[in-house]
Amino acid sequence: MAPKKDVKKPAAAAPAPAPAPAPAPAKPKEEKIDLSAIKIEFSKEQQEEFKEAFLLFDRTGECKITLSQVGDVLRALGTNPTNAEVKKVLGNPSNEEMNAKKIEFEQFLPMMQAISNNKDQGGYEDFVEGLRVFDKEGNGTVMGAELRHVLATLGEKMKEEEVEALLAGQEDSNGCINYEAFVKHIMSV
C-alpha cells in the first residue's frame, strides 16, 4: 500500500468582517425661514400699532429689542407662537445670541408676518378640548393643583410664578377651575 500523502486541509476561512454599522439617521434639516422673501401684508395702521408695541420693549432707547424679547412682543400683539416657532423664525440662535443680539423694527416685521401666516395656531376649541382630558368628573372643571402641575411640567414648561399669575382668581372654593371660563380669560389677556 502506498503511503498516504500528507494532505493539508485548507485553512479555515477567516470570519467575514462585521458589517459596518449603519450610519446614524440624519436629523431632518430645520427649514430656515427666508425673512427677505416674506411679503408684508399688514396695513400702515397695523404696522404703526406693531411699532408702538415693539418700542415699549426697547429698554435702551436704541429702537431695538433683544432676540429674547421677540416672543414677548409677538404675544403682546395677539399671536400665540410656541417658543420653538419663535426660535425658528429667529434662525435658531444660541442662548447667548438670544440675550446679546438685537434687532430693529424693520427686521421684526417679517417675523410678525411669518408667525401671523402660520394657520396652525390653536384656538378656543383646541384649548378647551385639551383641558377636557383632565376633567375627571365631566362637569366642566379641572383641579387647580393638577392644572398647576401640567403647566409647570409638560410641553413648554412655565415658571411657578407664571402659573400662579395665570391662575390667580380662577379657582372656586373647592380648588376647581372652570376650564371654559379659564380659556376665555387667558385668550382675552
Swiss-Prot record:
Q: List modified residues, type Phosphoserine.
A: 68, 94
Residues where Phosphothreonine occurs? Answer: 66, 82
Q: Which residues carry this modification: N,N,N-trimethylalanine?
A: 2
> Any one cellular component term from GO for this entry?
myofibril
Which BP terms in the Gene Ontology apply to this protein?
Answer: cardiac muscle contraction; muscle contraction
Q: Does the keyword Lipid metabolism apply?
A: no
Which segments constitute the EF-hand domain?
A: 45-80, 122-157, 157-189
Membrane-spanning residues:
none
Output the SUPFAM superfamilies linked to this UniProt entry. EF-hand
Q: Does the keyword Metal-binding apply?
A: no
Please list the residue ranges that the record marks as compositionally biased, kind Pro residues. 16-26
Protein keywords = Acetylation, Methylation, Motor protein, Muscle protein, Myosin, Phosphoprotein, Repeat
Write down the Gene3D superfamilies for this protein, in alphabetical order. EF-hand (1.10.238.10)
GO function terms (MF aspect): calcium ion binding; structural constituent of muscle
Briefly state the modifications made to the protein after translation: Isoform MLC3 is acetylated at position 2.
Disordered: region residues: 1-30
> How does this protein assemble?
Myosin is a hexamer of 2 heavy chains and 4 light chains. Does not bind calcium.
Q: What does this protein do?
A: Non-regulatory myosin light chain required for proper formation and/or maintenance of myofibers, and thus appropriate muscle function.
- Put simply, this protein is called Myosin light chain 1/3, skeletal muscle isoform
Record organism: Rattus norvegicus (Rat)
- The gene name reads Myl1
